């Protein structure tokens, strides 16, 4: 018999195995969720799926570390789009700033044309 997925403020609670993978307890996960006001830590939206992913720093060999050590690499909770595309493990803050400058320059050019 499969259990119904549990939710907290409309957000799906990760499985115990998922929490264990990141060295977290459900209470720690809920603390992060509460600190983020029950939304994605990046776009500040409630995902339509109700699912927030555990975003973590991508460090070589982190899965072999103790639970306590793995927990230190958790950055927050993010929706699928932000976790997959904005926080991709190859993306760094300077790259995001460059992307923002690129888009802002495009918007400025468009505004001049109008």
Q: Model segments located where?
A:
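Positively charged, low-complexity intrinsically disordered regions
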Residues: 7-10, 57-59, 110-111
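Short, charged surface segments at domain edges that flank catalytic/cofactor-binding sites
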Residues: 7-39
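Terminal non-globular linear segments
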Residues: 30-55, 101, 108-114
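Histidine-centered nuclease catalytic patch
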Residues: 39-81, 86
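A detector for short metal-coordination/catalytic motifs
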Residues: 86, 90-114
């Amino acid at each position: 018999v499969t259990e119904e997925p549990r939710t907290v403020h409309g957000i799906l609670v990760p499985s115990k195995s998922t929490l264990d993978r990141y060295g977290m307890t459900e209470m720690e996960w809920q603390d992060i969720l509460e600190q983020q006001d029950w939304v994605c830590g990046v776009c500040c939206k409630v995902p339509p799926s109700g699912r927030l992913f555990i975003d973590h720093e991508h460090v070589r060999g982190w899965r072999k570390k103790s639970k306590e050590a793995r927990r230190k690499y958790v950055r927050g909770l993010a929706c699928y789009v932000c976790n997959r595309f904005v926080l991709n493990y190859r993306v760094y803050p300077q790259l995001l700033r460059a992307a923002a400058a690129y888009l802002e320059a495009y918007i400025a050019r468009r505004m001049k044309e109008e």
